[in-house]
């Protein structure tokens, strides 16, 4: 019995058109779970805005991490790994932006089957 580990990398970008936006990751496919090891985020335009991370899926949004104030430098967001179940997503809620702000969020981790192969 061995476990197949599939690297997970996702990049979300946004050019703000107003003060608030939500970015959503791809959902975890059926039969798998996803471990997020790192989230880094930057407002590449200016040091302004805030971000909250929510776990979404199955009709709910669960607040995951405390509010972070954005800067132009890359900021690490996680203090420990985060595990998502089938069909769950992460939602990045951005507030306090100005139209034209360029936001970039990078996720790294891995997917693995719920049942060993």
Regions found by a protein language model. Give the residues of each.
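Noncatalytic modules at the cell exterior or secretory-pathway interfaces
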Residues: 81-98
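Hydrophobic beta-strand core residues of beta-sandwich domains
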Residues: 28, 68-70, 84, 97
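Exposed aromatic-hydrophobic patches
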Residues: 23-26, 74-81
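Short, surface-exposed beta-strand/strand-loop-strand elements in extracellular ectodomains
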Residues: 46-63
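Short aromatic-acidic-glycine turn motif
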Residues: 60-64, 114-117
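Solvent-exposed serine/threonine-rich low-complexity stretches and specific carbohydrate-binding patches
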Residues: 10-13, 62-70
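Solvent-exposed, conformationally flexible loop/turn segments
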Residues: 14-21, 69-75, 87
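C-terminal interaction-tip segments
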Residues: 1-34, 38, 44, 95-117
């Amino acid at each position: 019995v061995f476990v197949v580990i599939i690297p997970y990398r996702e990049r979300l970008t946004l050019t703000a058109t107003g003060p608030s936006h939500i970015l959503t990751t791809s959902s975890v496919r059926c039969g798998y779970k996803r471990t997020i090891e790192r989230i880094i985020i930057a407002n590449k335009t200016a040091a302004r805005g805030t971000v909250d991370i929510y776990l979404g899926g199955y009709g709910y949004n669960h607040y995951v991490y405390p509010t972070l104030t954005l800067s132009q430098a890359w900021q690490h967001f996680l203090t420990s790994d985060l595990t998502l179940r089938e069909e769950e997503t992460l939602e990045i809620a951005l507030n306090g932006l100005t139209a034209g702000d360029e936001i970039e969020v990078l996720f790294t981790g891995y997917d693995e089957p719920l049942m060993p192969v």
